[in-house]
Amino acid sequence: MVTTYLLFIVAYLLGSIPFALVVGKIGYGIDIREHGSGNLGGTNTFRTLGKKAGFIVTIADILKGTLATSLPMVFGLDIHPLWFGLAAVLGHVYPIFAKFRGGKAVATSAGVLLCYSPVVFAILAVVFFTLLFTTRYVSLSSMVTAVVAVIASIVSGDKIFIIAMCLLAGMVIYKHRANIGRIINKTEPKANFSKKQK
């Protein structure tokens, strides 16, 4: 039992590592919270620091979810791995290492799925990038993909999977509530795939 509680804490702390903040400060001398949307996630990193930093942060944020979700399997615990994944996403959104001001749950949630169900992860990746290249809205693509994740979990019939996806989708949509208003008002920034970045 003690090991279980400790691993939940480890999962949360893994999620709390603010890679966008670390990369910005160490690699560029910039506090990314003071630039762009102020969000500690991949999208703001891409827009503020460029493609290289954006890819590094996004991959690192994905791995946080993957590593946390794998903890019960690595340590032989008979506990559903998605609970640990949820702890990591909670850490990503409300990181103790960055005054509880983190990202929007997308990349770390993707990492949770990558570990738990690579097939669903692959399907959602196709959905996300199809929407992204069609609409050029990262936020809209993220929210719609989150809803599709819930549908996929319902189709699977796995009750814990359904609960976890509902919680993650709710968190993703909640963290994008300001984006929803900007999309409606047509003031939401679009991804610019042709623009040269650092």
Curated annotation (Swiss-Prot):
The keyword Cell membrane applies. It comes from the Bacteria. Its EC number is 2.3.1.275. GO terms for cellular component: plasma membrane. It is a multi-pass membrane protein. It catalyses: an acyl phosphate + sn-glycerol 3-phosphate = a 1-acyl-sn-glycero-3-phosphate + phosphate. It holds the Pfam family G3P_acyltransf. It is found in: Cell membrane. GO terms for molecular function: acyl-phosphate glycerol-3-phosphate acyltransferase activity. GO terms for biological process: phospholipid biosynthetic process. Pathway: Lipid metabolism; phospholipid metabolism. The chain crosses the membrane at residues 4-24, 71-91, 113-133, 147-167. InterPro entries: G3P_acylTferase_PlsY. The keyword Cell membrane applies. Keywords: Cell membrane, Lipid biosynthesis, Lipid metabolism, Membrane, Phospholipid biosynthesis, Phospholipid metabolism, Transferase, Transmembrane, Transmembrane helix. Its main location: membrane. Belongs to the PlsY family. Catalyzes the transfer of an acyl group from acyl-phosphate (acyl-PO(4)) to glycerol-3-phosphate (G3P) to form lysophosphatidic acid (LPA). This enzyme utilizes acyl-phosphate as fatty acyl donor, but not acyl-CoA or acyl-ACP. Probably interacts with PlsX. NCBIfam families: glycerol-3-phosphate 1-O-acyltransferase PlsY. This is Glycerol-3-phosphate acyltransferase 2. It comes from Bacillus cereus (strain ZK / E33L).
